[in-house]
Amino acid sequence: MWNPKKKSEALAKFKSFPYPKPGTSNVLDSKEGDTRRKYFTKTHLHRLFVFVVLLLCSGYFLKHTLLTRPKESNVVMIFVNNIGGGVLDVKSPRQWELEKISTENKKKYAERHGYHFFVKSTGLKRRYAHEWRESWEKADYIMEAMKKYPHAEWFWWVDLTTFIMEPQYSLEKLIINRLDHIATRNITDSMEFNPKNFHEIPFVDYSEDINFILGQDCNGFSLGSFLVRRSDWTSRLMDFLWDPVVYGQKHMDWPHDEQNAIEYFYENNAWLRSGMGFVPLRLFNSYPPGACAGEGENPRFFYNQKEGDFLVNLAGCNYGRDCLDEINHYKGLAQRKRGWRKLVPFL
């Protein structure tokens, strides 16, 4: 016989199955949820670990394979040492150490950015005792580098007594690609820095390409670090600098050698002014305390660690200062500043 009460009880059981009654917990579901959460947590940690490992391996691979593949560089670094000493004095152990530190610094920078590294030694050549012709030979070395690397466009001369403080900066990003924004063409303008008091001359065309990039210090043109571009203009300048007649007549009158020569040509030749561009000295030729005597702490000239100056030039360290002590000081500053990068191998 049909019983409505039993039917209601059966229907109630059917509706509640397999869900728990209100106010009760499902122990089985709780255990399964905990297991799933633990599984997903372990899986996520494992995936994160694999991702970090792959990232580090990729960085290492890029640094040591793709980024170091040989390529035809557009830049040549010209660096001159003096293996045999010279006519002025005998080379001491401290001078050897200075040369070793400076050479290693430049070589690492060239390797980092894929630049050609053109090293020349002045050697023990016969010279007159009253001459210091190594400076005049800059023109020869630049022309020799141009012949050796016929496809390169820019040639960076950098003195022995310099130290690159921020090697992560390429010359392209630092200077070459920004010339339109950072270079001054006419330093005779009243608003520009003009320590030699040059005057305007006619027929100068500042719309021509820049072929010579340099800075000025308290005494005039600074040639411890400068850039020249391969061009007919540069070939003409090199010929002027090494002309035997000019050298024979003027080398005793110009105590600063090629610096005085270029200043003389700049003062009197419109074609030379048309191809030159001046950048702030500290852009790639900062001075240490002691250089530019009488200037105190003029921010125009002197190295500023906080602002990350690219290179320090120990100008004049051979006169009353210690070149080795100074280059070791700046080497230590650079190492401390970049120490954290050693934690990540591909930086």
From Swiss-Prot:
GO cellular component: endoplasmic reticulum membrane; Golgi apparatus; Golgi membrane
GO molecular function term, any single one: alpha-1,2-galactosyltransferase activity
GO BP: protein N-linked glycosylation
Bilayer-crossing regions: 45-62
Stretches of the chain found on the membrane's Cytoplasmic side: 1-44
Keywords noted in UniProt: Endoplasmic reticulum, Glycosyltransferase, Membrane, Signal-anchor, Transferase, Transmembrane, Transmembrane helix
Membrane topology: Single-pass type II membrane protein
Entry EC no(s): 2.4.1.-
Subcellular location(s) of the protein: Endoplasmic reticulum membrane
Lumenal side: 63-347
Xref: Pfam families: Glyco_transf_34 (PF05637)
InterPro entries: Glyco_trans_34, Nucleotide-diphossugar_trans
Protein family according to the UniProt entry: Belongs to the glycosyltransferase 34 family.
Protein's UniProt name: Uncharacterized alpha-1,2-galactosyltransferase C637.06
Organism from which the protein derives: Schizosaccharomyces pombe (strain 972 / ATCC 24843) (Fission yeast)
